[in-house]
A protein has these predicted regions:
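N-terminal Lys/Arg-rich, disordered targeting/topogenic segments
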Residues: 1-3
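C-terminal motif of bacterial Sec signal peptides marking the signal peptidase cleavage site
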Residues: 26-29
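Sec-dependent N-terminal signal peptides
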Residues: 7-22
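Solvent-exposed loop and capping/linker segments of extracellular ligand-binding repeat ectodomains
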Residues: 31-37, 41-487
């Protein structure tokens, strides 16, 4: 599996300079300016705020119900009995049974687990070749080998249940249908094949289902720990994939790229690596569940060479260089996220175990309406939610102690904010230009409001912050509706 976060370790000083210039130009182009590095307590120069129109809060996007797809994979073959062994042709060996063909007339075929008291362990090459009327087939989980072209010409196939494994020397699904390369696989797998339930195995190989354009609903086995690079690339009809019940640890680069119909992706908490562009081109994605934001965790194993580069200052840890949502959608830098994130994305849920939301994590993720954070997150990084235009409310878990500079800067539709009981540190310009923000509740542990913290919050009417003893410059600049607080 190709693991591109490590490529970040090869960035030299020239590339770093280019990215710094890109960031500077991007910030200059924005309608307001995030805070520069400033020593806390210094007097900040006056910030001139432009006239900002409060946006229409209406958002009529509604998540699509995927229950039909879930039911389809869960109930597949549930009431269909196995065919009689007398209708199958097969060979019996000392180790098991190899099915070589079928002579019956069933259009929905469930192969039995055992024949003559021995497990069915293999499907021979060409075993069901040319069965153009076959609608569905279930291969028992005891099977460890399926020969090439076993289902070639099964052009009416709509549903299939089969173990995860590959033909010898052909690690791609299309080989079962006569393809001789993964690139050609999509042309051999029947477009009619829409439902696939995979069983057994621990790896979905690289390019395994490359361009299988008819697949709509797929269930991943509860034993799989790795999904390879480009595994479901260009599966343009893939709408639903059941994956959150697995012990998955790694998803390769562009594993689901080009899955233009995919509605949601819910990964398990066990994942420690997510490849570059994993969801690039998933233009209809509405919700996602991830264990962290970025390409990998800080405990992701590095080579000695990579460790030396980090210690020598020639590189940063890939968990830091990839710690933004746009990385998963193909953006090479966090400032490019807006051009890659699907406009359909409404909800992001971060799973328990995540301890921090990195700087720039959701930078200009303008379409997102809701981000669910788990108890255990301790810090919201700098610019973490900068420019999240459709974020309407935020309630932090009690574990959060710090909010970085510009963390919610420019969240123009956010109306309410509530800090958890553990919050004590607010960054400068943390809520600047949140023009729709009406109500803010901060715990008594917050004792200082830093420079420009609420500047430009035109709608702010209620601020509950009884622990505040000091405040910086221009904290409430243009907060004309707020009463009881001094500029």
């Amino acid at each position: 599996m190709k693991k591109h976060p490590k490529a970040a370790l090869r960035f030299g000083s020239a590339v770093a300079a280019m990215l710094a210039l890109t960031l500077l130009l991007s910030m200059t182009a924005c309608f307001d300016t995030p805070v520069e590095d400033t020593t806390e307590g210094e007097t900040q120069e006056a910030v001139t705020l432009p006239t900002i129109t409060i946006p229409d809060p209406t958002d009529d996007r509604a998540p699509t119900d995927t229950a039909e797809y879930a039911e389809r994979v869960e109930s597949l073959f549930a009431t269909i009995p196995p065919v009689s062994a007398s209708d199958l042709t097969y060979e019996v060996t000392e180790d098991g049974v190899t099915v070589t063909g079928y002579a019956g007339g069933e259009l929905i075929l469930v192969i039995p687990d055992t024949i003559e008291d021995k497990p069915v362990t293999a499907i021979a090459e060409n075993a069901f070749k040319g069965m153009g009327n076959l609608k569905a087939i279930s291969v028992p989980h005891s099977v460890t080998t399926i020969g090439k072209s076993a289902f070639e010409g099964c052009v009416s196939l709509t549903s299939m249940r089969t173990p995860v494994f590959t033909c010898e020397d052909a690690p791609y699904f299309g080989a079962l249908f006569g393809a001789t390369s993964h690139e050609a696989g999509g042309g051999y797998v029947p477009v009619s094949l829409s439902t696939l339930v995979l069983t057994g195995g621990d790896t979905i190989p690289d390019y395994a289902f490359y361009a299988c354009r008819g697949l709509e609903a797929v269930s991943i086995p509860e034993t799989v720990t790795e999904i390879g690079a480009f595994a479901f690339y260009a599966c343009q009809s893939l709408t639903y994939i059941a994956i959150d019940h697995t012990p998955l640890t790694a998803v390769g680069e562009r594993a689901f790229a080009g899955c233009a119909a995919l509605l949601n992706l819910h990964l398990p908490v066990t994942v420690t690596y997510m490849g570059s562009g994993m969801l690039e081109g998933c233009g209809k994605l509405e919700s996602m569940t991830i264990p962290f934001v970025g390409g990998c965790t800080y405990d992701y194993p590095l080579t000695e060479e990579e460790k030396d580069a980090i210690e020598g200052g020639d590189a940063v840890h890939p968990a830091e260089s990839t710690g933004y949502l746009g990385y998963l959608f193909g953006a090479s830098h966090y400032t490019f996220t807006a051009g890659y994130l699907p406009a359909s994305l409404i909800t992001v849920t971060v799973l328990e175990g995540c301890e921090s939301i990195p700087a720039n994590a959701f930078f200009e993720c303008a379409s997102i309406r809701e981000v669910n954070l788990p108890e255990g997150v301790m810090e919201i990084g700098r610019r973490a939610f900068y420019g999240c235009d459709y974020l309407t409310a935020m309630t932090l878990p009690d574990s959060v102690t710090k909010i970085g500079d510009d963390a919610f800067h420019g969240c123009i539709r956010m109306q309410t904010f509530a800090g958890g009981a553990g919050l004590s540190d607010l960054g400068m310009q943390a809520f600047m230009n949140c023009v729709s923000l009406e109500t803010v509740t901060l715990p008594d542990s917050v004792t200082k409001l830093p420079n420009s913290c609420f500047a430009g919050c035109l709608s702010l009417t209620t601020l509950t912050a009884e622990g505040v003893k000091t405040q910086g410059d221009r904290v409430f600049h243009k907060c004309d509706k707020l009463r009881g607080w001094e500029e």
